[in-house]
């Protein structure tokens, strides 16, 4: 069955006309949002792949974002792991993460659709920073909704958003993390669907967002594929990325889907363990359901109530996942596993100590997954998506890794 599904995944255009990836995806929203989503879908169809839009988008990526981002060989990790390790360096993009690719594209689209303001949600703060920066660049007001828990643990990014001119609104309802921030942004959009553009930060939500975000982020994988052929002389044996909502992973994976010899591996937030509420691994532990406008895999109880999640990483601390990831797992084309908090922090410390790269805690989950993969695939050529830099995580690292280091030195 999996072999046939893999073939279908490569042959069939996704999503279909209803915004479905197999059984996942679609659009489950209040009637008040249907006209806004219809306008967005029409705008995407009209503009996204037009020569004019692509020329402006690619120029912004080149001259402002700093693309293409580097592909770096990791010689010490390669030696330690017994593999050939390469890093796709989205941490080197303007604002410090992959989120800027999507934000620039969507704010350009917002202007073409006649929106007067941009709103966004954020977890780790990187999408908020990217949206604020893109809005400032293109002359639009910006409001960012952020869970109160994340406001506290990602304070540096809150200040960055404010300096970039955005209004940051802490959300105290629900679990006060990313899911609550998305809910609040959707409420704002419902109140003013004509004048407001919702710049959704991940490949989640109702159609056409999962498709739109994937198309804007696929520049990551297109660059990485060409760079691997140029610098490594071959495609990777495995491509590994962290997965929360899944935008950096789908952007990296998508251009490799047709390369059947390349294994694709997503690494979720395993948190404290397998118990409900102890992790944010919806592909590993979730069940099908509707979350924030999309049918996907979500962490819910036996009564269908979405449960709170836990991860040391704010950017992965989400109770669902993009519907295309749910489909790719079901199809067998992409494998998914999880890394626990301590495992991710250990991988972060290893990368910093031996490669001189302070990666984001989100990306550190992928680094741990890559180390685990290398242990069973000696000599493998591995490409890791370094989705962002770890500067934003210093408050968390002060309480965890640096505290442990200080204790060791006493």
Language model: regions and residue ranges:
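Glycine-rich ThDP/TPP pyrophosphate-binding loop and its adjacent helix/strand module
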Residues: 179-188, 195, 204-262
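Claisen-condensing/thiolase-fold acyl-transfer catalytic domains that form or cleave C-C bonds
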Residues: 243, 247, 341-405
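Active-site-proximal loop->helix
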Residues: 119, 127-185, 275-286, 394-402
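Active-site nucleophile and cofactor-binding loops and adjacent substrate-binding regions
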Residues: 89-102, 118-128, 174-175, 217, ...
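Active-site/ligand-binding loops adjacent to catalytic centers
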Residues: 182-208, 212, 261, 266-357, ...
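Positively charged, low-complexity intrinsically disordered leader regions
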Residues: 2-25, 38-115
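Short glycine/serine/threonine-rich phosphate/pyrophosphate-binding segments
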Residues: 96, 100-106, 117-138, 152-154, ...
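A short, small-residue-rich loop immediately preceding and capping a beta-strand
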Residues: 94, 110-147, 235-248, 264-267, ...
């Amino acid at each position: 069955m999996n072999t046939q599904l893999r073939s279908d995944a490569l042959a069939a255009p996704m999503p279909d006309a209803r915004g479905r990836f197999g059984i996942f995806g679609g659009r489950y929203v209040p009637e008040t949002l249907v006209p806004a989503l219809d306008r967005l879908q029409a705008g995407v169809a009209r503009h996204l792949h037009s020569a004019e839009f692509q020329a402006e988008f690619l120029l912004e990526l080149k001259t402002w974002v700093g693309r293409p981002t580097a592909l770096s060989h990791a010689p010490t990790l390669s030696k330690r792991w017994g593999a050939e390790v390469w890093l796709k360096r989205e941490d080197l993009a303007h604002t410090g993460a992959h989120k800027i690719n999507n934000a620039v594209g969507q704010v350009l689209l917002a202007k073409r659709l006649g929106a007067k303001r941009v709103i966004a949600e954020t977890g780790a703060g990187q999408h908020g920073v990217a949206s604020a920066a893109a809005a400032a660049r293109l002359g639009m007001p910006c409001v960012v909704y952020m869970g109160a828990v994340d406001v506290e643990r990602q304070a540096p990014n809150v200040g960055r958003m404010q300096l970039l001119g955005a209004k940051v609104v802490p959300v105290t309802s629900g679990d006060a993390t990313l899911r609550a921030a998305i809910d609040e942004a959707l409420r704002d959009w419902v109140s003013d669907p004509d004048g407001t553009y919702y710049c959704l930060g991940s490949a989640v939500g109702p159609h056409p967002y999962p498709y739109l975000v994937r198309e804007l982020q696929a520049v990551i994988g297109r660059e990485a594929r060409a760079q691997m052929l140029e610098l490594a002389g071959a495609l990777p044996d495995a491509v590994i990325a962290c997965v929360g909502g899944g935008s950096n992973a789908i952007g990296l994976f998508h251009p490799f889907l047709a390369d059947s010899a390349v294994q694709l591996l997503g690494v979720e937030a395993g948190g404290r363990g397998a118990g409900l509420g102890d992790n944010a691994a919806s592909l590993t532990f979730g069940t099908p359901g509707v979350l924030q406008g999309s049918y996907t895999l979500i962490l819910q109880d036996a009564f269908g109530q979405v449960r709170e999640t836990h991860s040391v990483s704010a950017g992965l601390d989400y109770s669902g996942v993009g519907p295309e990831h749910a489909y790719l797992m079901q199809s067998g084309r992409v494998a998914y596993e999880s890394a626990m908090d301590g495992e991710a922090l250990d991988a972060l410390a290893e990368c910093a100590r031996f490669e001189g790269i302070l990666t984001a805690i989100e990306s550190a989950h992928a680094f741990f997954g890559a180390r685990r993969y290398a242990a069973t695939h000696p000599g493998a050529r591995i490409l890791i998506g370094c989705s962002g830099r770890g500067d934003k995580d210093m408050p968390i690292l002060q309480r965890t890794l640096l505290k442990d280091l200080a204790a060791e030195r006493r």
